[in-house]
Amino acid sequence: MTRRTVLGAASTAMALQAQNGLAKFVRFRKGARIAYGALNGEEVRELSGDFLKGGKPNGTVHKLKDVKLLAPVLPGKIIAIARNYKSHLGTVAPPSRPEMFYKPTACICGPEDAIVLPKDSTDVHYEGELVAVIGKKLKNATAAEAAAGVFGVTCGNDVSERQWQGGPDKDIQWWRAKGSDTFGPLGPVVVTGLDYSKLMLRTRLNGKVVQEQSTSELIFDVPTMIAFTSKYVTLEPGDVVYTGTPGTTKKMSPGDVVEVDIEGIGVLRNRVTSS
């Protein structure tokens, strides 16, 4: 069954690839309906089902302005990595192995959704990141197998409450520091066929660039971190891997607008609100 799913998803992506070799997939709401689609300019070609399960164009076309884009996938697992750019380490030595952690699936939100600050939070930061979307079941994968198992990539924001992460009020695990509701913005599209090893990542806060670095400067590249994870946790189609944030980060406040802009993918935009 898994093999059929992988083959179907791959064939759909290949069929929908544009002249530049890329395909952009979305999940969207139109009225009360939620559906999957392929984005082509300002139009969304509706699919018969989930693009990860081989959904194909069903003949219905929507104008992009007439639909609400949602988080493009609903992952069964969210894996993330800490300290994966030297620019984010400060004076700390680079890790000897990928330092992975979980984010709960309830933290996922989509483009233009609000990042809602918990009432007792005091120091919530943005973390713009490239996110890999898994396309096939991976267990004990080699780096080459892990690379082949990536369906596509999207933008993510690993929103983090620093006091709960490492301050006086820190928890044993980062369940609320990085997993509170809306702390996992994702989207706006999943792009296939893109060389994600050297993409420029920029984060803007209220229009000002606050993070800017190429994914070529990851300490552990995407296949390496996925292969490492698969030694211990089986990855399934639709799971996502946040690949780390560069540089320094700052506190967000209600009313702020944060944008994660990755070359070849697009812009993930969210407004910050209080609960």
What is the predicted function of each stretch?
Residues 91, 112-114, 141-146, 164-169, ...:
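A short secondary-structure junction signal
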Residues 3-10, 16-98, 194-196, 202-204, ...:
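N-terminal non-catalytic cap/leader segment that marks the start of a structured domain
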Residues 68-70, 89-91, 115-124, 138-145, ...:
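A generic local secondary-structure boundary/capping motif
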Residues 74, 125-127, 236, 253-254:
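Residue-level recognition of short, solvent-exposed, well-ordered loop/turn junctions
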Residues 94-111, 126, 259-263:
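Structural signature of FAD isoalloxazine-binding scaffolds in flavoprotein oxidoreductases
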